[in-house]
């Protein structure tokens, strides 16, 4: 499409078409202030064939990233005729300059803030001493030793409990034996007391018999004396007056008979005495032997009972000592557990503090990353605006040496850079 760039060639029809195109192609740019979102433009760029020249009255508007609802109309024939910017281009340049200055100030402030934050982080990292976990291996070894001692003490307590049970059973057996022996002793003592009663009765009987024998001896002596007296009296009365010889049986000798009776009684008495003494001696010997054996058994039982009592006392003392040792070990274990629990709580508090610091550092890093992304987006928008600004400056530099469209020098080649700039501006501004 060829267009006439002369002043007289710009007819009212082309002016109306240019104004309508400018109004129809007014660029409304919407920017979203998101960190990762790039500025989007609602500018609809008309498509033109490559190498085609646009009419001067209907140039597409230049869309600038970051400008909100700012009409940027580029392509009025006034700049070709007058060689200066119109009011819209001046306002756009002023707006871009203000935006560039504000962005530069923001970038400078953010760089200073970033440097300050880096210095603070570096100082904080230098000040923070790395947390070194203390070595608790010695405490763990002590705990293991105490646990081994507790296990050994428990085993020893079990062994002592078994021995104590065995001693109790043995003591019960000896107690039953002692009771049986005591009952036997009581029976033997009862028999001895009965035999002693019989012995007393026999002694009384013996004394009675001895008294009876003595009385019989006295009677015999009295009889002998009375017989001798009677014989003497008779012999004295008879004298020598009468001598009578009788052929009769010989008279018995009373003395001899009495002697024989005395001998028989004495023999029987001696035999009875000997038998009684032998029986008494045998019974006494047997009772003495039983008493000695019972005394020996009783002494042995008493000795065993004393030994068992001594052993039971010793075991009870050892049990009390082991119980006290176990209680002390349990107290020590409880104190150790409490101490380790407090230390673990302190360590957990330190870990929580470090985790909170790490979380704060992560939040700071995330915030800085977000700010960095925002800065990158801002930088991209600034670069886009700078490119647009540079394009406008280049276009201004390219337009300044050109004369307004004269009737003699205006041709198709003269407007070629303008149309190329407009196409380049549209391609760079509205991708």
UniProtKB/Swiss-Prot annotation:
Region (Head): 1-89
Annotated region (Coil 1A), positions in chain: 90-124
Region (Linker 12): 237-252
Site residues, Stutter: 338
SMART domains for this protein: Filament
GO biological process, alphabetically ordered: epithelial cell differentiation; intermediate filament organization
Signal peptide boundaries: none
Function noted in UniProt: May play a role in late hair differentiation.
Subunit structure: Heterotetramer of two type I and two type II keratins.
Name the record gives this protein: Keratin, type I cytoskeletal 40
Organism: Bos taurus
Gene: KRT40
